[in-house]
Amino acid sequence: MTETDGFYKSREVFDPAEQYKMDHKRRGVALIFNHERFFWHLTLPERRGTNADRDNLTRRFSDLGFEVKCFNDLRAEELLLKIHEVSTSSHIDADCFICVFLSHGEGNHVYAYDAKIEIQTLTGLFKGDKCQSLVGKPKIFIIQACRGSQHDVPVVPLDMVDHQTDKLDNVTQVDAASVYTLPAGADFLMCYSVAEGYYSHRETVNGSWYIQDLCEMLARYGSSLEFTELLTLVNRKVSQRRVDFCKDPDAIGKKQVPCFASMLTKKLHFCPKPSK
Protein backbone atom coordinates (compact mmCIF):
# COMPACT_ATOMS: atom_id res chain seq x y z
CA MET A 1 0.00 0.00 0.00
CA THR A 2 2.86 2.38 0.79
CA GLU A 3 4.31 1.97 -2.70
CA THR A 4 0.89 2.49 -4.28
CA ASP A 5 0.30 5.62 -2.21
CA GLY A 6 3.68 6.94 -3.28
CA PHE A 7 2.87 6.25 -6.93
CA TYR A 8 -0.34 8.24 -6.85
CA LYS A 9 1.27 11.08 -4.92
CA SER A 10 3.92 11.42 -7.60
CA ARG A 11 1.16 11.91 -10.18
CA GLU A 12 -0.45 14.83 -8.34
CA VAL A 13 -0.38 18.23 -9.99
CA PHE A 14 2.47 20.30 -8.55
CA ASP A 15 1.55 23.95 -8.10
CA PRO A 16 4.67 26.14 -7.70
CA ALA A 17 2.51 29.05 -6.55
CA GLU A 18 0.78 27.15 -3.74
CA GLN A 19 0.45 29.22 -0.57
CA TYR A 20 -0.07 28.41 3.08
CA LYS A 21 -3.70 28.80 4.10
CA MET A 22 -4.06 32.05 6.00
CA ASP A 23 -7.84 32.07 6.41
CA HIS A 24 -8.11 30.61 9.90
CA LYS A 25 -9.97 32.46 12.64
CA ARG A 26 -6.74 33.72 14.23
CA ARG A 27 -3.40 34.79 12.77
CA GLY A 28 -1.66 33.10 15.67
CA VAL A 29 0.61 33.77 18.63
CA ALA A 30 3.85 35.75 18.42
CA LEU A 31 6.12 35.20 21.41
CA ILE A 32 8.88 37.73 22.10
CA PHE A 33 11.53 36.80 24.66
CA ASN A 34 13.45 40.00 25.35
CA HIS A 35 16.67 39.90 27.35
CA GLU A 36 18.38 43.10 28.40
CA ARG A 37 20.10 42.08 31.64
CA PHE A 38 21.74 38.84 32.73
CA PHE A 39 22.80 37.12 35.94
CA TRP A 40 26.16 38.55 36.98
CA HIS A 41 27.87 35.16 36.97
CA LEU A 42 27.39 34.87 33.19
CA THR A 43 29.53 38.03 32.72
CA LEU A 44 27.36 39.08 29.78
CA PRO A 45 26.93 42.82 29.08
CA GLU A 46 23.55 44.53 29.14
CA ARG A 47 21.83 44.74 25.77
CA ARG A 48 20.94 48.43 25.66
CA GLY A 49 18.44 49.19 22.90
CA THR A 50 16.72 45.80 23.00
CA ASN A 51 13.50 47.29 24.42
CA ALA A 52 13.21 49.37 21.25
CA ASP A 53 13.35 46.10 19.29
CA ARG A 54 10.67 44.56 21.51
CA ASP A 55 8.32 47.51 21.11
CA ASN A 56 8.93 47.78 17.36
CA LEU A 57 8.21 44.08 16.81
CA THR A 58 5.10 44.27 19.00
CA ARG A 59 3.66 47.02 16.79
CA ARG A 60 4.48 45.27 13.54
CA PHE A 61 3.17 41.84 14.54
CA SER A 62 0.03 43.36 16.05
CA ASP A 63 -0.60 45.18 12.77
CA LEU A 64 -0.42 41.82 10.98
CA GLY A 65 -3.03 40.37 13.33
CA PHE A 66 -0.85 38.38 15.72
CA GLU A 67 -1.57 37.96 19.41
CA VAL A 68 1.74 39.26 20.77
CA LYS A 69 3.05 38.05 24.13
CA CYS A 70 6.23 39.69 25.48
CA PHE A 71 8.43 38.36 28.27
CA ASN A 72 11.39 40.24 29.72
CA ASP A 73 14.54 38.80 31.30
CA LEU A 74 13.01 35.43 32.15
CA ARG A 75 15.09 32.79 33.88
CA ALA A 76 15.66 29.64 31.82
CA GLU A 77 13.15 27.61 33.83
CA GLU A 78 10.50 30.30 33.45
CA LEU A 79 11.16 30.65 29.72
CA LEU A 80 10.90 26.91 29.11
CA LEU A 81 7.65 26.80 31.06
CA LYS A 82 6.14 29.63 29.00
CA ILE A 83 7.11 28.15 25.66
CA HIS A 84 5.93 24.68 26.75
CA GLU A 85 2.55 26.15 27.66
CA VAL A 86 2.22 27.63 24.18
CA SER A 87 3.40 24.48 22.41
CA THR A 88 0.83 22.34 24.24
CA SER A 89 -2.07 24.74 23.69
CA SER A 90 -4.33 24.46 20.64
CA HIS A 91 -3.40 26.28 17.43
CA ILE A 92 -6.10 24.58 15.39
CA ASP A 93 -7.77 27.89 14.49
CA ALA A 94 -4.47 29.75 13.90
CA ASP A 95 -2.62 30.45 10.65
CA CYS A 96 0.91 30.12 12.01
CA PHE A 97 3.28 30.72 14.94
CA ILE A 98 6.17 33.13 15.57
CA CYS A 99 8.82 33.05 18.28
CA VAL A 100 11.45 35.79 18.70
CA PHE A 101 14.60 35.74 20.86
CA LEU A 102 16.37 39.02 21.57
CA SER A 103 19.45 38.02 23.52
CA HIS A 104 23.07 36.93 23.46
CA GLY A 105 23.89 33.58 21.88
CA GLU A 106 26.56 30.90 21.83
CA GLY A 107 26.92 27.83 19.62
CA ASN A 108 23.49 26.22 19.35
CA HIS A 109 22.17 28.11 22.38
CA VAL A 110 20.56 31.42 23.29
CA TYR A 111 20.77 32.97 26.73
CA ALA A 112 17.95 33.43 29.20
CA TYR A 113 18.60 35.61 32.26
CA ASP A 114 20.53 32.96 34.18
CA ALA A 115 21.50 30.19 31.75
CA LYS A 116 21.71 29.24 28.10
CA ILE A 117 19.04 27.17 26.35
CA GLU A 118 19.54 24.94 23.33
CA ILE A 119 17.66 26.28 20.31
CA GLN A 120 16.69 22.79 19.17
CA THR A 121 15.04 22.20 22.54
CA LEU A 122 12.77 25.13 21.75
CA THR A 123 12.04 24.30 18.12
CA GLY A 124 11.55 20.64 19.01
CA LEU A 125 8.50 21.52 21.09
CA PHE A 126 6.72 22.64 17.90
CA LYS A 127 7.43 19.64 15.68
CA GLY A 128 4.53 17.52 14.52
CA ASP A 129 4.73 14.86 17.21
CA LYS A 130 4.70 17.48 19.98
CA CYS A 131 2.37 20.14 18.53
CA GLN A 132 -0.09 18.52 16.13
CA SER A 133 -2.25 21.64 15.73
CA LEU A 134 0.66 23.38 13.93
CA VAL A 135 1.35 20.53 11.51
CA GLY A 136 1.52 21.91 7.98
CA LYS A 137 1.56 25.51 9.25
CA PRO A 138 4.48 27.98 9.22
CA LYS A 139 6.57 28.09 12.39
CA ILE A 140 8.87 31.12 12.32
CA PHE A 141 11.78 31.60 14.73
CA ILE A 142 13.60 34.94 14.69
CA ILE A 143 16.91 35.12 16.55
CA GLN A 144 18.63 38.43 17.19
CA ALA A 145 21.99 37.42 18.64
CA CYS A 146 25.64 37.54 17.71
CA ARG A 147 26.99 34.50 15.87
CA GLY A 148 30.77 34.74 15.86
CA SER A 149 34.02 36.60 16.44
CA GLN A 150 34.40 38.32 13.06
CA HIS A 151 33.19 41.57 11.56
CA ASP A 152 32.22 41.73 7.90
CA VAL A 153 34.83 43.83 6.09
CA PRO A 154 33.06 46.34 3.85
CA VAL A 155 33.65 46.48 0.12
CA VAL A 156 31.64 49.56 -0.82
CA PRO A 157 30.78 50.68 -4.40
CA LEU A 158 32.30 54.06 -5.23
CA ASP A 159 28.90 55.69 -5.80
CA MET A 160 27.41 54.47 -2.54
CA VAL A 161 26.96 56.86 0.39
CA ASP A 162 26.50 55.15 3.75
CA HIS A 163 23.96 56.45 6.21
CA GLN A 164 25.41 58.67 8.94
CA THR A 165 23.57 59.02 12.24
CA ASP A 166 23.09 62.51 13.67
CA LYS A 167 23.20 61.45 17.32
CA LEU A 168 26.60 60.61 18.74
CA ASP A 169 25.02 58.99 21.79
CA ASN A 170 23.41 56.28 19.65
CA VAL A 171 26.45 54.01 19.90
CA THR A 172 26.66 50.68 18.09
CA GLN A 173 27.31 47.60 20.24
CA VAL A 174 27.63 43.91 19.44
CA ASP A 175 25.75 40.94 20.89
CA ALA A 176 28.10 38.45 22.50
CA ALA A 177 29.27 35.03 21.31
CA SER A 178 27.91 32.96 18.41
CA VAL A 179 24.86 31.03 17.22
CA TYR A 180 24.87 28.28 14.58
CA THR A 181 22.36 27.82 11.78
CA LEU A 182 20.15 24.91 12.82
CA PRO A 183 17.71 22.76 10.88
CA ALA A 184 14.33 22.45 12.53
CA GLY A 185 11.97 20.47 10.27
CA ALA A 186 9.30 20.93 7.62
CA ASP A 187 7.40 24.24 7.66
CA PHE A 188 9.97 25.92 9.92
CA LEU A 189 11.65 29.21 9.01
CA MET A 190 14.77 30.12 11.00
CA CYS A 191 15.68 33.81 10.72
CA TYR A 192 19.07 34.97 12.00
CA SER A 193 20.28 38.53 12.51
CA VAL A 194 23.68 37.70 11.03
CA ALA A 195 25.43 35.01 9.01
CA GLU A 196 27.29 32.40 11.02
CA GLY A 197 30.65 33.51 12.38
CA TYR A 198 30.00 37.26 12.36
CA TYR A 199 28.94 39.98 14.78
CA SER A 200 25.38 41.26 15.06
CA HIS A 201 25.15 45.02 15.65
CA ARG A 202 22.78 46.81 18.00
CA GLU A 203 22.37 50.56 18.53
CA THR A 204 21.91 51.62 22.14
CA VAL A 205 18.98 53.93 21.30
CA ASN A 206 17.33 52.59 18.14
CA GLY A 207 17.81 48.86 18.68
CA SER A 208 19.48 46.24 16.52
CA TRP A 209 20.09 46.81 12.80
CA TYR A 210 18.32 43.60 11.90
CA ILE A 211 15.15 44.23 13.89
CA GLN A 212 15.02 47.88 12.79
CA ASP A 213 15.11 46.90 9.13
CA LEU A 214 12.87 43.86 9.56
CA CYS A 215 10.22 46.06 11.17
CA GLU A 216 10.55 48.70 8.46
CA MET A 217 10.00 46.07 5.75
CA LEU A 218 7.07 44.58 7.69
CA ALA A 219 5.48 48.02 7.95
CA ARG A 220 5.86 48.61 4.21
CA TYR A 221 5.36 45.16 2.71
CA GLY A 222 4.23 42.84 5.53
CA SER A 223 0.77 42.20 4.11
CA SER A 224 1.68 42.32 0.42
CA LEU A 225 5.05 40.62 -0.17
CA GLU A 226 5.85 36.92 0.16
CA PHE A 227 7.68 36.60 3.47
CA THR A 228 10.97 35.07 2.29
CA GLU A 229 11.14 37.78 -0.39
CA LEU A 230 10.65 40.33 2.38
CA LEU A 231 13.52 38.72 4.32
CA THR A 232 15.74 39.09 1.26
CA LEU A 233 14.97 42.82 1.28
CA VAL A 234 15.94 42.90 4.95
CA ASN A 235 19.27 41.26 4.05
CA ARG A 236 19.88 44.01 1.51
CA LYS A 237 18.92 46.82 3.89
CA VAL A 238 21.14 45.57 6.71
CA SER A 239 24.07 44.93 4.36
CA GLN A 240 24.03 48.60 3.35
CA ARG A 241 24.68 49.75 6.93
CA ARG A 242 28.08 50.26 8.57
CA VAL A 243 29.34 50.95 12.08
CA ASP A 244 29.91 54.69 12.55
CA PHE A 245 30.27 55.03 16.33
CA CYS A 246 31.52 52.27 18.62
CA LYS A 247 33.72 51.98 21.71
CA ASP A 248 35.67 49.26 19.89
CA PRO A 249 37.77 51.07 17.24
CA ASP A 250 38.19 47.82 15.30
CA ALA A 251 34.42 47.76 14.71
CA ILE A 252 34.28 51.15 12.96
CA GLY A 253 33.32 50.74 9.31
CA LYS A 254 32.33 47.09 9.69
CA LYS A 255 29.13 45.67 8.20
CA GLN A 256 26.61 42.86 8.73
CA VAL A 257 24.55 40.47 6.59
CA PRO A 258 21.60 38.51 8.06
CA CYS A 259 20.50 35.12 6.80
CA PHE A 260 17.54 32.77 6.98
CA ALA A 261 17.12 29.02 6.62
CA SER A 262 13.78 28.16 5.07
CA MET A 263 12.17 24.77 5.44
CA LEU A 264 8.85 26.18 4.26
CA THR A 265 7.08 24.07 1.66
CA LYS A 266 4.76 26.75 0.25
CA LYS A 267 4.71 30.49 -0.26
CA LEU A 268 3.93 32.55 2.83
CA HIS A 269 1.76 35.67 2.60
CA PHE A 270 0.33 37.50 5.62
CA CYS A 271 -2.82 38.46 3.76
CA PRO A 272 -4.99 41.02 5.59
CA LYS A 273 -7.76 39.45 7.62
CA PRO A 274 -11.36 40.67 7.26
CA SER A 275 -12.36 43.40 9.69
CA LYS A 276 -14.39 42.11 12.61
Swiss-Prot record:
The keyword Lipoprotein applies. Residues 108-125 are annotated as: 130's region. Disruption phenotype: Casp6-knockout mice are grossly normal, breed with Mendelian ratio, and are only slightly protected from anti-Fas/CD95-induced cell death. Casp6-deficient neurons undergo apoptosis and exhibit soma and axon degeneration just as wild type neurons. While Casp6-deficiency is able to block axon degeneration with local deprivation, it is incapable of doing so with global deprivation. In addition, B-cell differentiation into plasma cells is accelerated in deletion mutants compared to wild-type. Casp6-knockout mice are more susceptible to influenza virus infection. Residues 25-27 are annotated as: Tri-arginine exosite. One of its GO terms (biological process) is activation of innate immune response. It comes from the Eukaryota. During activation, the N-terminal disordered prodomain is removed by cleavage. Concomitantly, double cleavage gives rise to a large 18-kDa and a small 11-kDa subunit. The two large and two small subunits then assemble to form the active CASP6 complex. Can be cleaved and activated by different caspases, depending on the context. Cleaved and activated by caspase-8 (CASP8) and subsequently by caspase-3 (CASP3). Can also undergo autoactivation by mediating autocleavage at Asp-162 and Asp-175, while it is not able to cleave its N-terminal disordered prodomain. It is found in: Cytoplasm; Nucleus. GO terms for cellular component: cytoplasm; cytosol; nucleoplasm; nucleus. The active site is at residues 104, 146. The modification Phosphoserine is found at residues 62, 239. A lipid is attached at residues 246, 259 (S-palmitoyl cysteine). Heterotetramer that consists of two anti-parallel arranged heterodimers, each one formed by a 18 kDa (p18) and a 11 kDa (p11) subunit. Interacts with BIRC6/bruce. Interacts with RIPK3. The N-terminal disordered prodomain is required to prevent self-activation. The Tri-arginine exosite is required to recruit substrates for hydrolysis. This is Caspase-6.
